[in-house]
Amino acid sequence: MPGWISGASQLYEQLRNSVPWLEHDRRMFNQVFREPRMTAVYKHVADVPDARLLQAVCALSRHYGVEYDGLWMNLYRNGQDSTGWHRDHGSCRKLDCIVPVLTLGTIRRFLIKPIKGGRSMTFKPSSGDLVVMGGRAQQDWVHCVPKEPEIEGTRISVNFMSSAQGVRD
């Protein structure tokens, strides 16, 4: 949904400068790797860092009939930060889920492809756009934000979580 939230530039600056972003290590292939992005988790909507996000939670909950009760945010510092192909297991444990993602900041490619193989599709959401992965998207598709070394700007993704749809760690 293009231009879903107004004041995207101000919200981006507020989140970039006030959220306690963290780096995490991940064990894969018997090695430990630093995740190429930073994250912040708000398990309770009462704790979200900006009132506009609370308004977004309420609007999305009303619109989709899903109680969104937390946020998972990613900060991609530049084009070297990325996330590989994955499904959102933690926020979608049911067959049909609705996972909205608000994009803020620099435009980055967002790719999806069928889990059983096939060509990927590329989207380039702008700051303030809402990407909604609904239905069986988390069962039948994988998605990623690939590295783009030429990108210098920062991107934030705000993932709206629902404990009714998934189990949080």
Located regions from the model:
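Non-heme Fe(II) oxygenase metal-center motifs and adjacent flexible, charged/small-residue loops
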Residues: M1-D169
